[in-house]
Amino acid sequence: MQAKIIYALSAISALIPLGSSLLAPIEDPIVSNKYLISYIDEDDWSDRILQNQSVMNSGYIVNMGDDLECFIQNASTQLNDVLEDSNEHSNSEKTALLTKTLNQGVKTIFDKLNERCIFYQAGFWIYEYCPGIEFVQFHGRVNTKTGEIVNRDESLVYRLGKPKANVEEREFELLYDDVGYYISEIIGSGDICDVTGAERMVEIQYVCGGSNSGPSTIQWVRETKICVYEAQVTIPELCNLELLAKNEDQKNASPILCRMPAKSKIGSNSIDLITKYEPIFLGSGIYFLRPFNTDERDKLMVTDNAMSNWDEITETYYQKFGNAINKMLSLRLVSLPNGHILQPGDSCVWLAEVVDMKDRFQTTLSLNILNSQRAEIFFNKTFTFNEDNGNFLSYKIGDHGESTELGQITHSNKADINTAEIRSDEYLINTDNELFLRISKEIAEVKELLNEIVSPHEMEVIFENMRNQPNNDFELALMNKLKSSLNDDNKVEQINNARMDDDESTSHTTRDIGEAGSQTTGNTESEVTNVAAGVFIEHDEL
């Protein structure tokens, strides 16, 4: 998977180049096997497994108890390939299936995107796609609640592509990559590129994704060559088409085929769980369970035996769930009750039952996402849901939305928890793939270095120059906050120096580097960390 690297401009770019992958999937720190479980009836089990010698040679049958049998492939074989080879499908049938999928997919695209513009904000730029009209890139701000553009800079608007006026002339293709099938549309007739002299163009990749009832969204936009772009648009309704429904986790999972036992012989177990929910692997032995019935709530499933004792929650639990929640947010799996996809800038209180592989309740997780782009994780078996509003107790869309209270959480703050003597630990995570923590750490390092080599007067000159010609909004905000923390420390240092030597001249506006180094030892590492933690970066600036 390709990850795009971005570099955020710092106070002195030569000293601290900051980098972070944009929406890069979080790798599972503990390698866990992933499985895709499918269920067939008695007749299919006999025909496709028991009486198919090539299949039987590729794996073995395991009795799972409760009249449940499953066929598991050997590590060196692929069950899907064997089953596909055993099915006699003609080339004409396969071609017909591909053609049908493409036609139905294109119809879905027109039905769901007709006369509706969608946008995607990536730092300085906003990308807006109005199907049948244009795909543009511009600088401005978006009211995430109303979808209205605010303060659009008309001098920074670039048309990346314009679809053909005649719908019949628009060209769609059904393509395949490492993840699965998607529908591709090439849109040309964009603005002339200053570098190449050619028209800008964009390929739009329509894929299955998002919440079952959520809106269509732009997942990412990237420039693959100069003035040539790719954009991925997720449309939940495309998941109703079999070829488009398979996601990356399913492709990488080891398939298991099980015989469906009679319902009367089984209770609540993994069959009920998997047939009611779509499992999406988040890493660290944790799955996001998305219900097929939209009236049901999302759940989190734990398959890691290391997280089986919920009466003694250790730091490992928080680390693994922190990684899993980060990936859940980056994949945009959570939808608000109004259909809005939860994204950076929103705040909410979100609850989810944590269950094991047999759908047995373990505890309840509370995810509290704050306006600061930080989030708190709480575990408590006594948390209660508001039955009318799914997983949410409250939510707020962006900075412009009004907070919508959906209910009250049991023991929702530390004071209540401590008074009631109920265990409900918290763990701080970051919703932007550790970018905030990395920036805070490197700001501390730069602040400490600048205190050693630059006088307060020289620091003021540097900041004044940056204020006059800042490279972007992020740098301006970063500079102002760093300046504030540096000034506070410099004032303390000046007072200490005055007390140590009343006779020392205060008329000098510069210091020798060697002298500065000897005078800054009063800043301990803990002090630097505390100052860095106070540096706050709003989402809009990122």
Curated annotation (Swiss-Prot):
Domain MRH: 115-241
Single GO MF annotation: oligosaccharide binding
Record-level GO BP terms: detection of unfolded protein; endoplasmic reticulum unfolded protein response; ERAD pathway; retrograde protein transport, ER to cytosol; ubiquitin-dependent glycoprotein ERAD pathway
GO cellular component, one term: endoplasmic reticulum lumen
Biased composition range(s): Basic and acidic residues: 505-514
Main location, first listed in the record: endoplasmic reticulum
UniProt motif (Prevents secretion from ER) ranges: 539-542
UniProt: a mannooligosaccharide derivative binding residues: W125, Q137, D194, R200, E223, Y229
Composition skew (Polar residues), residue ranges: 517-528
Signal peptide bounds: 1-21
Similarity field: Belongs to the OS-9 family.
Name of this protein: Protein OS-9 homolog
Organism: Saccharomyces cerevisiae (strain ATCC 204508 / S288c) (Baker's yeast)
